[in-house]
């Protein structure tokens, strides 16, 4: 499957992808990634406030992946995530936007061909409204990152946690996105296997 990663932000975003690596995207630029069929627990995110040297080493304010331009693993919270597992049983792809690792950039995650399946959006500037206890440089932390308790992180397994006032802060602003780890019923979507996708940083914001 191909993923077109598009930066519509007025600022530079350093895209990260696992699998895929990373790339600097100035406003209006696109990075096309080819992801192998059957890839699971894959994700794409944006990094902000980065400085890299000629060897691709440095640091980002949000989404940093061990100081590397070419990510080899996941990024550090807070970062808005497009997550996907491809070619799963019944010829389905599973796709979602997750705020379980917090929020740094508004995002739209959609099939490249409109209408094939759900256009998943988190197009609100959550950082600007972030509760004081969740504020982080350049973003807004999920309460799981801050408090690391089962109440917020669901570490004790299925059915041991539910929505909280702090998870609802995210859900109210981005109803399509995971606000806590067991938010599956309203946040996990399927597309036909073989679908190609588009991930947009800073889509036109919802009012």
Swiss-Prot record:
GO terms for biological process: defense response. Not glycosylated. It is found in: Secreted. Signal peptide: none annotated. Pfam families: Thaumatin. Disulfide bonds join 9-202, 50-60, 65-71, 117-191, 122-174, 130-140, 144-153, 154-161. One of its GO terms (cellular component) is extracellular region. Its EC number is 3.2.1.-. On the 2D-gel the determined pI of this protein is: 4.4. Belongs to the thaumatin family. Monomer. Acidic thaumatin-like protein. Exhibits weak beta-1,3-glucanase activity with laminarin as substrate. This is Thaumatin-like protein 1. It comes from Manilkara zapota. The lineage of its organism: Eukaryota, Viridiplantae, Streptophyta, Embryophyta, Tracheophyta.
């Amino acid at each position: 499957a191909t993923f077109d990663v598009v930066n519509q932000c007025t600022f530079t975003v350093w895209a990260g992808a696992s699998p895929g690596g990373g790339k600097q995207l100035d406003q209006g630029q696109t990075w096309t990634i080819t992801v192998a069929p059957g890839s699971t627990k894959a994700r794409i995110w944006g990094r902000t406030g980065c400085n890299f040297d000629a060897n691709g080493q440095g640091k980002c304010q949000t989404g940093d992946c061990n100081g590397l331009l070419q990510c080899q693993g996941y990024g550090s919270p807070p970062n808005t995530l497009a997550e996907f597992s491809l070619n799963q049983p019944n010829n389905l792809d599973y796709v979602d936007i997750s705020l379980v690792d917090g929020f740094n950039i508004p995002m739209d995650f959609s099939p490249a061909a409109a209408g094939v399946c759900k256009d998943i959006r988190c197009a609100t500037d959550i950082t600007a409204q972030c509760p004081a206890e969740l504020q982080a440089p350049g973003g807004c932390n999920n309460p799981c990152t801050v408090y690391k308790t089962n109440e917020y992180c669901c570490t004790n397994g299925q059915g041991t946690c539910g929505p909280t006032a702090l998870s609802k802060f995210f859900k109210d602003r981005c109803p399509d996105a995971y606000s806590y780890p067991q938010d599956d019923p309203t946040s996990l979507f399927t597309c036909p296997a073989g679908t190609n996708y588009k991930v947009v940083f800073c889509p036109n914001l919802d009012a």
